[in-house]
Amino acid sequence: MAVGHVDVLVGVPTLNNAGTIRPVVKAVHQAFSRYFPRDRTVLINSDGGSEDGTPNLVRNASADDTETVTVLHSLRTIHRISTPYHGVPGKGNALRQIMTAADLTQARAVAVLNADVTGITPEGVASLIRPVRDQQYDYVAPVYRRHPLDGPLVTQLIRPLMRAAYGWQVREPVAPEFACSSRFIAHCLEQDVWDSELGRVGIDLWVTGEALAGGFRCCQTGISPHPTMLSRTPFGELFEQVVSSAFTCLERHSAYWLPRHGSDALALAGPLPTSTIEAPATDGSRLTEAFARDLDNLRYVLESILGEQTLASLLRMAETQGSHLRYPDELWVSTVYEFLLAYRRGVMRREHIVQALAPLYLGRTGSFLRQFSSAHETEVEEALESLCLHFERAKPDLVQRWNHLGALH
């Protein structure tokens, strides 16, 4: 199908997503019809070889295939294209194909959606696209309305680490949805990340880091409610992918973040969502029990990663507090930064370093959940902000030690 120049392009990477793709496609169709009726629009499905009929569902879908809706009819044809990508299955190759298509069609605004995000709405799709299309932003990150106890891998580790390093307050640095400009796409396509492990499993984090470190005009916009995402990746594998990607991004972008101090708020291109969200039903006991059980087994490994004072504090905490432990902010920050430095030094196989961090992360998360499971959302948000500030205050020591490692190489 010849499409030519387009105004708005939405890309959806897929691999065996027949069970979830239909509401995503429907939301895109409705966003095109309601909010961009005069624009040339195209939906690109970049498929990694699905065997469940996902591409056919995309090609045959329509905006009202599950219910009758009243929309402003588009004045232009909405194009749908489903095409396989080549190479190792993974979002990196799919995103590369989507960006290549956007570059070829000179798309003014591009949004990327996850095929598992079944709760995405037409308004959410439009909220991502508008800042690029109408306000000339280069990169748009979503802000979900979700309870602050939800998503602890982001709130306890990735968000404060990325904020302290890059100096920008991005609430969802690992979000599978984002929007970007043709200028940012041209930049991304020139980078050497696509055939790497980071490109295969950590492309979402890399895109965020590249936008911040590349000096592009970035913003955030509200999406409500938090889309339901059905992850099919086991926790251990997901943790290793996300943390390894974050550490690798910090290596790649060190020239940008090492001189930065503090953090700045990222511009808001739209109102933040305000709907009420229930807290996750957990008190963290199971996580702290796993920490207390596994820490001693990891002692030999941790001796090669952590400083003596940090390791001694962890062992003492596990011995005296057990499953009722309180993992202080300062100790958690020291833990994460020392793991990052060990990752850079290569004290052992990098996957083993990251795997050793997982039980400590569970202990920190369990401790936080136990402490704040009954707290008001405002109190939890204040505690998360305090954690971010601890990461920022400890950054000068990290920078000094990082630079010392560079001098030794």
PLM ranges: what are they?
Residues I120-V143:
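Conserved donor-nucleotide/metal-binding helix-loop-beta segment in metal-dependent transferases, i.e.
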Residues D138-P152, G167:
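Short beta-strand-to-loop element that shapes/binds the nucleotide-sugar donor at the catalytic cleft/hinge
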